[in-house]
Amino acid sequence: MVSPIGTKASEEQCYMGTYHSTRGRTLSCSSKVAIRTGIAPDGGLFVSDELGTQQLDISSLADKSYFEIAQDVLGMLLNDYTAEEISACVDEAYRGTFASKEVTPLVKLDAAPGADAPQTYVMELFGGPTSAFKDVALQMLPRLMARTSAKDGGAERIMIVTATSGDTGKAALAGFADAPGTGITVFYPEGKVSRVQNLQMSTQEGDNVAVCGIRGNFDDAQSAVKRIFADKELAERLEAAGTVLSSANSNNVGRLVPQVVYYFAAYAQLLRTGAIEAGDAVEFCVPTGNFGDILAGYYAKRMGLPVAKLVVASDKNNVLADFLTTGVYDRNRPFFTTISPSMDILISSNLERMLYFLSDGDCELVAGLMEQLAQTGRYEVPAELLAKIQSVFGCGWASEDEVRTAIKSCWDANGYVIDPHTACGYHVFEQVAPAEGAKARVLLSTASPYKFPRACCDALGLDVPEDDFEAMRMLEQATNTVAPTQLAELESKPVRFEDVCDVNEMASYVESAAKRMSTN
C-alpha cells in the first residue's frame, strides 16, 4: 500500500483477497484496499491473477451503451464493489461530463495512414472536463475511492500525491477538488509542460488542492513521489494526524481499470457501424509514456477483446520502443523536452504489470528486474519473455520533425487536426505494417489539439503567435474548429498556485499541505 508503508497498520489492511503485489504474493487484499492505498507494501503494483478468468460476450457489445459496458468491465475487475456501487460510480463519472454520449467516440479517417492499411479510426478520448484522456479514469477514481472507508485504508482522510508530465495533474485535480475526505497535491516539472497545461493546474479551484512545480523533469518528480510513499516516518506522522497517502497515477489500479472500458466501447462502435463483425480482430495504436493506457488494452485482450496487435507509439524519449525491440530497458540516456510533453518519460511504471502477466506471474523475476532498474537504471528480459512480449506489442517512435509532419499529413488527407501526442501514433501507423488479420485500426487520441495550439499551428505552417491563446484563435480560424470552452477560459482565470521547490523539498511540501487541508 502507498501509506503507511511498512507499518503495522498497513499490513493489517492486507488479507487474503483478489489483489497482490507484482513483486510477491505474501499479502493480498481487496480491490477497495488496493484503490484506497495505491501501491503494495513492497513497492510493487497491485495485480489480480483473476484477470482473464471472466470474458465479456463480444457478440452482445453492439447493443450496449458505454455505461453498460463500463458496468460489465468494472464489475469483473473490482469484484468487491457491489453492482449498485459500480452503477452509481459510472453514472456520476460520465453522465453529462463528456461532450459525446459515446464518451469516447470514434472518428473515421478518409485516408488511412500507412500502406495497405485497413480502415482506420481515431478514438477521441479528450471529451472530458480537462480535454485529455486522463479524464476517463480520473472522473471515475474519486467515485471509487468514495465507496471505500477508513477500514480499507487505516485513516479518515486520503491525501492524493501525484507527479504529472502534464495531463494527469489537471485531470486528478478536477476529479478530487472538494471531494469529501480527500486532499490532493500535484507536482509537475517546472517549465516542461505547455502553458495551457500549466494554467489548467495553477488556476485550479478547491479548498483541498495544492500544486507545485519542481526543479527537474517528470522522472525526477515520479521517483521522488515513490520515495515519499516509502517514507515510514512521514507515513507514521501523517497517520497520527488521520491522513493516509494514496496515488492518482496509473500505478493505482483504480486509475487503470476504467481505461479498459474504452477498448471494448471502440469495438462496440465498430460493430454498430458494420465496420467489423463479432470476432474480427482490431489493431490499436497508443501514444504512451508510462505504459498505462496501452496496458489497459492488454487487460481488454485478456478479457476477450479480439486484439490483433497493441502498438506503442513513443516520442523522441523512445525508451519503450527500444525495450520492445531489444528486450533491454535502459533509462541511462539523455532526456528530451519535446512538443509532446506528456510522453517525456524515461521510467514507465506500468511496464511492471505487463512483465508480471507475460512472465506468467513470476514475482521473483519482476522484483529482480525492478531492483536492477533502481540500482543500475537498466535491465534485460530473457529472450523467451521478449518473444512473448513482441507477440502482443508492436512499437515505433517519432522525431520532432516527424510529429509535425504527421499533424500536417493528417490535416491534408483528412481535414482533421490531431495534437502532438496523437501525431506520434499517426506516424507510427504510417510506418508499421498492419498486423496480420486486423480488420480495422484504431488510433487513440489522447488530448485536444487546443492543449498544444502553438505546436499545432507551427505544424500546419501558420505564423505562430507567442501567446497560446492567440494560437488557439488562429487554429480555430484556420481549421474551422472550436476550442473547448474550459481551455479558452483559462486566459482570464486567476492563478492560485505559483510554488516551486527542489526535489528534496517535496516531502515537506506534502506534509505541510496535509496539515493545512486537515484544518479546512
Language-model segments: which ranges?
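PLP-dependent amino-acid enzyme catalytic core
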Residues: 2-520
